[in-house]
């Protein structure tokens, strides 16, 4: 232990020589690596493995430094491996490598001490004898893995030769497969003939079905033509209208009627156009009757349809009104018309009554379609006096701050102060 404790007092060169004598690799000793190398040296002297050295680095340095002593260890280690497991080649080689790395350390590290202590002649004699001893065991076991390989390859080749003998068995089965192929070909030929015959039958059925569809379609077209010719039937009834009025909106042109209709139209100057649903002879699901804007209203000595004109003017008050009022008004009841008039009166003028005027007759409240609305007046009243504005301002202050009671208290205090100054 005294030798171990003296490492801290040694210089770098002495410590390096001590490491080489112990069998450690030739590493230069510096102040930074001194502690690590001292630990490795103490571990090697104590019989422990160096903690910081990896096996790869030690193997490289050990094989390079002592050249003659290295082959003796693997040679000695290779003999028991071949004897224990001679049949398996790959595990034997792996076992050699791992055992040599472990066993080669001690003789390599202790060779320099023996060489230093003994004479140089004895060291040379040991180095010359060790390779001779290493050559003897390596020659004999080297042949064993070769023999095992030869036996393994020969056994594998024998198995491979035996396997092709089974091929004639498959050749014997070929005529049976050829019979099956012939049967399948014959079966396909028979089926193909059946498929062709069935295609012809389907084609004939398709042609017959197409003819039936064409015949049914032609019959339907004939029935629809007959039904459409009798759907547009109109019944005109003469009726006296009181009071008469003029149309003040622009109506769309009426559809062209059948040639039998104008004769009935020429007989009456004032008539109501109504559609009689009971007189429709069409048994179909849908009717071709289309109701237009020129039907369903009452005319009283009105000019022809083409001469209708509108004197309705667009103003700011009715700018946002519906554009289809003229079309929808004919379906409205009198109650709906009166309600619309009352709403217009409320919206228009808030002081004077607002009336809907008919442009043609000038009667107010008659429920006519066209009217000329007046411009809306401003919401501010006309008479704004200063006293009324001041009263409104006082009322607002009273509602918000209750200022009357506070003003009364202030005036009472001022009155008391005045009385005090007057009498005292």
Swiss-Prot record:
Disruption phenotype: No obvious phenotype. However females are sterile and aging males become prematurely sterile. Males and females exhibit a range of defects in their germarium that may be age dependent phenotypes. Most phenotypes result from defects in germline stem cell (GSC) differentiation that often lead to GSC loss. Also affects somatic cells of the ovarian stem cell niche, with delayed terminal filament formation and cap cell loss. In 10 day old males, stem cell niches display a decrease in hub cell number but somatic cyst stem cells are unaffected. Residues 271-400 are annotated as: Required for binding to Med. The modification Phosphoserine is found at residues 44, 50, 54, 152, 192, 198, 321, 326, 378, 385. This is Otefin. One of its GO terms (cellular component) is endomembrane system. The lineage of its organism: Eukaryota, Metazoa, Ecdysozoa, Arthropoda, Hexapoda. The modification Phosphothreonine is found at residues 63, 324, 358. Changing residue 63 to A: Prevents phosphorylation and displays an increase in the number of mitotic cells. Keywords: Cell cycle, Cell division, Chromosome, Cytoplasm, Cytoskeleton, Membrane, Mitosis, Nucleus, Phosphoprotein. Residues 1-50 are annotated as: Required for binding to Med and germline stem cell maintenance. GO terms for molecular function: DNA-binding transcription factor binding; transcription corepressor activity. A motif (Nuclear localization signal) lies at residues 92-99.
């Amino acid at each position: 232990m005294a030798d171990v404790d003296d490492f801290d007092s040694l210089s770098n060169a002495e410590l390096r020589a001590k490491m080489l004598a112990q069998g450690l690799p030739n590493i230069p000793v510096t102040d930074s690596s001194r502690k690590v190398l001292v630990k490795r040296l103490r571990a090697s002297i104590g019989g422990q493995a160096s903690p910081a050295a990896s096996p790869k680095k030690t193997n490289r340095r050990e094989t390079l430094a002592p050249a003659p002593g290295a082959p003796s260890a693997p040679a000695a280690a290779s003999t028991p491996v071949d004897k224990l497991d001679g049949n398996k080649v790959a595990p034997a080689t792996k076992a050699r490598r791992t055992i040599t790395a472990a066993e080669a350390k001690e003789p390599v590290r202790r060779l320099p001490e023996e060489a230093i202590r003994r004479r140089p002649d004895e060291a040379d004699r040991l180095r010359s004898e060790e390779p001779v001893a290493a050559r003897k065991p390596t020659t004999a076991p080297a042949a064993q893995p070769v023999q095992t390989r030869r036996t393994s390859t020969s056994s594998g080749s024998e198995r491979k030769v035996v396997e092709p003998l089974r091929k004639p068995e498959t050749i014997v089965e070929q005529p049976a497969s050829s019979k099956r192929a012939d049967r399948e070909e014959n079966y396909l030929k028979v089926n193909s003939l059946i498929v062709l015959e069935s295609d012809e039958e389907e084609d004939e059925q398709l042609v017959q079905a197409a003819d039936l569809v064409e015949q049914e379609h032609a019959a339907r077209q004939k029935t629809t033509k007959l039904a459409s010719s009798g759907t547009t039937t109109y019944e005109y009834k003469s009726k006296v209208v009181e009071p008469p009025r003029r149309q003040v909106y622009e109506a769309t042109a009426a559809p062209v009627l059948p040639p039998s209709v104008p004769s009935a139209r020429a007989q009456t100057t004032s008539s109501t156009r109504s559609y009689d649903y009971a007189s429709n002879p069409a048994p179909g699901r849908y009717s071709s009757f289309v109701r237009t804007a020129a039907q369903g209203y009452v005319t009283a000595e009105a000019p022809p349809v083409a001469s209708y004109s509108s004197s309705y003017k667009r103003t700011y008050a009715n700018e946002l009104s519906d554009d289809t009022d003229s079309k929808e008004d004919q379906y409205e009841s009198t109650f709906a018309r009166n309600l619309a008039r009352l709403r217009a009166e409320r919206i228009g003028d808030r002081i004077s009554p607002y009336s809907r005027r008919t442009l043609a007759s000038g009667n107010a409240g008659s429920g006519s379609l066209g009217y000329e609305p007046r411009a809306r007046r401003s919401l501010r009243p006309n008479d704004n006096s200063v006293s009324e504005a001041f009263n409104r301002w006082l009322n607002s202050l009273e509602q918000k701050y209750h200022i009357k009671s506070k003003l009364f208290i202030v005036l009472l205090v001022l009155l008391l102060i005045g009385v005090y100054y007057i009498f005292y």
